[in-house]
């Protein structure tokens, strides 16, 4: 099923929701807590992903069907402000504690990163968003490197088909940081976005977080790793900026868990 989304900046994005949903289902099954969705829940999930894609929130991996319905209801009633309110309510203190626990228990992520995650999440809760972003933005590639080292330690490597897809479709080699992150995601989720290049998480990482440049109007809502690390983006001190980076960290931690589970099978 191909969806067309008109984003807030006027751009049209076309993507195949069934391929994304199938990839998420396969990944969730591999970590053994996925309950098969009913037809109604599946349709709600499709609607949820469309809303997240339209509003540029990298939260589409969320598997909570109650939250899906809440987002849909808020969107229908209040549009983007309603959705953003629901997001901030949902991704609160309990979520942050669960995320920190997940990071701490990972057999993939380097334990020396844990104090950084703890401090960044604490800064976020205290409202020091510049500090939270500055710490976490450096850890995206860090988690990716941990995944690579984990595979190497276990005498494994990325599937050659994954590497070929990244090289052929996107023109990247794995020395490129963007390609390294995308390779990890594709490996973990078995995404083959043949119908669209904008599979949501891949698109967000590629065009927002890791793009070499971002227009000023985009920087008002998104963090760009290159611009932050080179000191050219200074306006990333908002709750929205920080939570979007946290969600990217969460997604990569989830991918790391999937890869670990797959390797153990």
Q: What role is predicted for each listed range?
A:
Residues 96-111, 189, 210-215:
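An acidic intrinsically disordered interaction segment
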Residues 104-140:
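A long, hydrophobic alpha-helical segment
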Residues 16, 91, 108-116, 219-223:
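Helix-boundary capping/turn motifs
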Residues 7-11, 127, 234:
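A generic structural motif
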Residues 130-134, 138-265:
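Amphipathic, oligomerization/interface secondary-structure segments
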Residues 29, 34-103:
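Internal, Lys/Arg-enriched amphipathic helical interaction segments that engage polyanionic partners
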Residues 1-35, 40:
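Long, C-terminal-biased catalytic regions of enzyme "large/alpha" subunits
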Residues 1-5, 110-125, 224, 228-231:
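Short amphipathic alpha-helical segments and their helix-coil junctions
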């Amino acid at each position: 099923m191909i969806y067309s989304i008109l984003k807030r900046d006027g751009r049209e994005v076309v993507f195949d929701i069934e391929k994304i949903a199938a990839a998420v289902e396969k990944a969730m099954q591999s970590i053994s807590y996925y309950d098969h969705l009913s037809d109604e829940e599946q349709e709600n999930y499709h609607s949820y992903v469309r809303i997240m894609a339209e509003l540029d929130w990298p939260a589409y991996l969320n598997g909570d069907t109650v939250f899906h319905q809440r987002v849909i209801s808020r969107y229908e009633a209040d549009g983007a402000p309603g959705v953003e309110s629901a997001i901030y309510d949902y991704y609160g203190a309990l979520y942050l504690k669960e995320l920190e626990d997940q990071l701490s228990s990972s057999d993939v992520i380097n334990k020396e990163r844990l104090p950084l995650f703890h401090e960044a999440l604490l800064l976020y809760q205290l409202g020091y968003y510049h500090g939270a972003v500055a710490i976490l933005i450096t850890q995206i590639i860090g988690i990716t490197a941990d995944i690579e080292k984990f595979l190497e330690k276990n005498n494994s490597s990325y599937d050659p088909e994954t590497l070929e897809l990244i090289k052929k479709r996107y023109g990247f080699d794995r020395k490129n940081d963007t390609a390294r992150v995308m390779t990890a995601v594709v490996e973990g989720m078995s995404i083959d976005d043949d119908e669209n290049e904008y599979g949501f998480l891949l698109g967000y990482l590629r065009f927002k977080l890791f793009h070499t440049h971002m227009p000023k109007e985009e920087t008002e809502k998104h963090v760009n790793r290159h611009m932050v690390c080179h000191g050219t983006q200074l306006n990333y001190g908002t709750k929205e900026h920080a939570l979007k980076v946290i969600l990217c960290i969460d997604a990569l931690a989830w991918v790391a868990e999937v890869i670990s589970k797959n390797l153990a099978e």
